[in-house]
């Protein structure tokens, strides 16, 4: 499904600010894989997501999705088949538009429809039914501007918008980090349910080591712009946060330097 081969990315090459963000990075995901990614600050996690999403082109290597080479496909074209959620719950929705209008835009874009088309009554009922699955009462507030929603409600809505037409790939970039613990747990439950029920191929960056081991079917750890650990199956089932950290240190000779990760 997703096949990344030997991509590298250096920012500001040849200057005092030169930064090697990705180094000969390779990754293969099968359809329906749900892989969590952890790593210290500067490990290359966000750069990886930006490369996959098409925010910039990698210096070397290739990226294929569903058998199609997208290495040089523009970002706006990739967004039709790649869904993405960011850490900031305000990123991903139009605050001055209603819930219904936000859903309509997401639906028409993902289904390759005309964004200026009228939404049918059947589509509106579909939106209402999908909103009810969030269990937040949003199905009764479809005419309300999104800017009036809480951060958790907006993030749940963004998740729904990104998956209402299942994408070929879903990128979750610490999408619950800015939420309070109770809301974060609810959004994570929604995430796991939607991803598993729709068999969506998913990559999720998290700072929470427990989440990294409990969610999905693979855990990847990054350092210095490449994967240093990839655990799945029985090895992952028997792994604890302590053993994950110890394995990272043994494999890299480094300690995790992000206190927020270690304390989660």
Kindly give the residue locations of the regions a language model identified:
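A short, flexible loop at the N-terminus of ABC-type nucleotide-binding domains that lies
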Residues: 1, 10-24, 74
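ABC ATPase NBD coupling module
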Residues: 15, 69-83, 91, 113-120, ...
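The feature captures the beta-strand-to-loop junction immediately N-terminal to the Walker
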Residues: 38-40
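Helix-to-loop junction immediately C-terminal to a conserved catalytic motif
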Residues: 53
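Conserved ABC transporter NBD signature motif
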Residues: 61-69, 229-231
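ABC ATPase C-loop
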Residues: 162-163
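H-loop/switch region of ABC-family ATPase nucleotide-binding domains
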Residues: 206-207
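Conserved beta-strand-loop-alpha-helix hinge in the C-terminal portion
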Residues: 226-252
């Amino acid at each position: 499904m997703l096949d990344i081969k030997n991509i590298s990315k250096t920012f500001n090459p040849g200057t005092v600010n030169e930064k090697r963000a990705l180094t000969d990075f390779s990754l293969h995901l099968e359809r329906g894989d749900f892989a969590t990614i952890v790593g210290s600050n500067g490990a290359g996690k966000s750069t990886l997501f930006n490369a996959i999403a098409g925010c910039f082109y990698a210096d070397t290597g290739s990226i294929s999705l569903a058998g199609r080479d997208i290495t040089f496909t523009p970002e706006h074209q990739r967004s039709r088949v790649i869904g993405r959620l960011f850490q900031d719950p305000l990123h991903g929705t139009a605050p001055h538009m209603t819930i219904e209008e936000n859903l309509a835009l997401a639906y028409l874009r993902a289904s390759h429809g005309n964004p200026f088309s009228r939404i049918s009554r059947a589509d509106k009922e579909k939106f209402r039914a999908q909103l009810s699955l969030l269990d937040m009462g949003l199905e009764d507030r479809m005419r309300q501007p999104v800017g009036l929603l809480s951060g958790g409600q907006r993030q749940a809505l963004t998740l729904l918008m990104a998956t209402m037409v299942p994408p070929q790939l879903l990128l979750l970039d610490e999408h619950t980090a800015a939420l309070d613990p109770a809301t974060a747990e609810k959004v994570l439950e929604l995430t796991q349910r939607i991803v598993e029920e729709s068999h969506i191929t998913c990559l999720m960056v998290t700072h929470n080591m427990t989440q990294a081991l409990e969610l999905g079917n693979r855990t990847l750890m990054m350092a210095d712009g490449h994967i240093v650990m990839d655990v799945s199956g029985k090895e992952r089932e028997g792994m604890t946060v302590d053993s994950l950290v110890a394995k990272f240190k043994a494999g890299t000779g480094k300690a995790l330097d992000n206190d927020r990760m270690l304390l989660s």
